[in-house]
Amino acid sequence: WRVGARDPSKGAFMKDSHGRVIDYMRISLTDRCNYRCIYCMPADGVTSLCHSDILSLEEIERVVRVAASMGIKRFRLTGGEPLVRKGAVDLVRAIHETPGVDDVSLTTNGVLLPKYAEELAAAGLSRVNISLDTLDPEQFRYITRRGELHEAIDGIEAALATGFDPVKVNAVTVRSLGQDFLAFAKMTIDRPLHMRFIEYMPVGESAGSHGC
């Protein structure tokens, strides 16, 4: 990327190597997660980063201010599972209140949305993406290793009830699992959901595992 200026009075902005203006940034709040999905993390022995090894919330806010001054208008918070990070709601509020920021969104597994959805909306969160790879309860437990399907469904319902728009569901497609994609399509018939299927990428420790 490179830095330019469309107008001295409007500050700097960033472009990629193809000349496209960059106005979007993803920020990972934590490497911690309350699931251990088979394509993402080992079942046991996961060593999380120490708090001293990740950016503090104040440092993230500083990054956002600098990025916004360079033309970044849209921010997405991810993880790990971002809602396990203490202070996530306050961070959403700080980003939303930063001059130049138009949109704050979140990618989550949905487990903590029933608890935090209303607070997040009040803080300025606009929309959410919820990761959900199957609608079969047994398969859900197999994929996440420690979750229950109703937790994710409750998260989706909480997001819809709170008024996030849009609410997107992300499903990673894994060949060996034989997921029922028609069930996902049916779920969107009576719910205003955006459904996205994401191709599994066999990288790192998950490459070749579970017959993927």
Task: Briefly describe each language-model feature range.
Residues S17-L57, S69-M70:
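Canonical Radical SAM [4Fe-4S] cluster-binding loop centered on the CxxxCxxC motif
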Residues I54-R76, V84-I189, H194:
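Radical SAM/AdoMet-radical enzyme domain recognition
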Residues E81:
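Conserved G/P- and acidic residue-centered "switch" motifs that form tight phosphate/ATP-binding loops
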Residues R175-G178, R196-C212:
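Flexible glycine/acidic-rich beta-alpha junction loops that bind and position SAM and/or redox cofactors
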